[in-house]
Amino acid sequence: MIFSKISQVAHYVPQQLVTNNDLASIMDTSHEWIFSRTGIAERHISRDEMTSDLAIQVADQLLTQSGLKADAIDFIIVATISPDATMPSTAAKVQAAIAATSAFAFDMTAACSGFVFALAMADKLIASGAYQNGMVIGAETLSKLVNWQDRATAVLFGDGAGGVLLEASKDKHVLAETLHTDGARCQSLISGETSLSSPYSIGKKAIATIQMDGRAIFDFAIRDVSKSILTLMAQSDITKDDIDYCLLHQANRRILDKIARKIDVPREKFLENMMRYGNTSAASIPILLSEAVQKGQIRLDGTQKILLSGFGGGLTWGSLIVKI
């Protein structure tokens, strides 16, 4: 049988840093108010780079690190809710920029679960035997979706990208998987609506910026995500002691605290970087993974079991246990 493995990781964030104190100068908030509620102290905001620019930086790094030629890449999946445009896809721009002429490319929209969903799909593509090498990138410029007068949401989000290179392997590395969607709760977190504008349409005001029912999302993350992780471990016969690190979507420090208690995994196994990046949606998990590899916490030698878990708009949530 053919399986997939993560062979390379990379990330990139825009240079411009926006601190909580910077935000306090343009809206009614303070560093203490933001940090005590979220664990976020600063975030990177793009000045002129689009989502594709961030993703291209990651793709270039992955290629360089791997030593592969661009035409050896079979597919590129970009998980994003903030594409440059609805057409062409962000992934198509990445494919062109790195000259991966043999690759097919497409975007995936699953909000903050996007990277996990895309990684699960990429694993199946390689397991089919038809493809050998693929890139999965989470990239966001959420700054263009934020209402900068709304302190409840503007303080949360940042821009950035992270990704992995998947290669075919004779050993199984994706050990367990669970993916979920509950569209009935979709109005809890929305953004980027468009209006009907033909001569035959009745106008409807669209919600362009991010709007969130914070309490509903907080409760969802604690209840549904924790339950699905516990179920996943039970079904796969993987215990909490088997897990080396937990890399969850970086939405809020208090969410991580509560999920750690719910699933009874030591809090120190939960890596975090939201203090420096905020919530970067589909980019948060791969950025966290890339930094952990840089720091030597995760070795990419196939000896560690890592829980990856994303959750967000849709509502969507999903987890993978991978051997890295």
Swiss-Prot record:
Where would you find this protein in the cell?
Answer: Cytoplasm
Pathway, per record: Lipid metabolism; fatty acid biosynthesis
SUPFAM superfamilies named in the record? Thiolase-like
UniProt xrefs under InterPro entries? ACP_syn_III_C, ACP_syn_III_N, FabH, Thiolase-like
GO molecular-function annotation terms? 3-oxoacyl-[acyl-carrier-protein] synthase activity; beta-ketoacyl-acyl-carrier-protein synthase III activity
Query: What's noted about domains in the record?
Result: The last Arg residue of the ACP-binding site is essential for the weak association between ACP/AcpP and FabH.
This chain's function reads:
Catalyzes the condensation reaction of fatty acid synthesis by the addition to an acyl acceptor of two carbons from malonyl-ACP. Catalyzes the first condensation reaction which initiates fatty acid synthesis and may therefore play a role in governing the total rate of fatty acid production. Possesses both acetoacetyl-ACP synthase and acetyl transacylase activities. Its substrate specificity determines the biosynthesis of branched-chain and/or straight-chain of fatty acids.
Which family is this sequence assigned to?
Belongs to the thiolase-like superfamily. FabH family.
Q: What is this protein called?
A: Beta-ketoacyl-[acyl-carrier-protein] synthase III
Per the UniProt entry, what species is this protein from, by scientific name?
Answer: Streptococcus pyogenes serotype M3 (strain ATCC BAA-595 / MGAS315)
